Amino acid sequence: MATRDSGGQSQTGRSQQGEEIEDVTTEASPEVAERHAEITEDVDDLLDEIDSVLEENAEEFVRGYVQKGGE
């Protein structure tokens, strides 16, 4: 009788859920912290602009989005 070969490696039933992951904290340089603050502010401004457009005319925004190939 022929045996079936799975062709792959067998897996053991071991799980890594029990392993603890060590928390690592690093301090960013002042330049990195400043750049992070600038990017965060830019993103917040962009999100505020999107919110205002949606509050004013959400239907037109959605219609334009769908016409451009969005789902």
Curated annotation (Swiss-Prot):
Tell me which InterPro entries the record gives: Ubiquitin-like_Pup
Q: Which cysteines are joined by disulfide bonds?
A: none
Question: What family is this?
Answer: Belongs to the prokaryotic ubiquitin-like protein family.
* Pfam family, any one: Pup
Supply the HAMAP family for this chain.
Pup (MF_02106)
Q: What do we know about how this protein assembles, alone or with others? A: Strongly interacts with the proteasome-associated ATPase ARC through a hydrophobic interface; the interacting region of Pup lies in its C-terminal half. There is one Pup binding site per ARC hexamer ring.
What biological processes does GO assign it? Answer: modification-dependent protein catabolic process; proteasomal protein catabolic process; protein pupylation
For this UniProt entry, the molecular function terms from Gene Ontology, in alphabetical order, are: proteasome binding; protein tag activity
Low complexity: bias regions? 1-18
Species per Swiss-Prot/TrEMBL record:
Salinispora arenicola (strain CNS-205)
The protein here is known as Prokaryotic ubiquitin-like protein Pup
Give the pathway listed in the UniProt entry for this protein: Protein degradation; proteasomal Pup-dependent pathway
Supply the alphabetized keyword list.
Coiled coil, Isopeptide bond, Ubl conjugation pathway
Origin: domain of life = Bacteria
Recorded coiled-coil stretches? 31-60
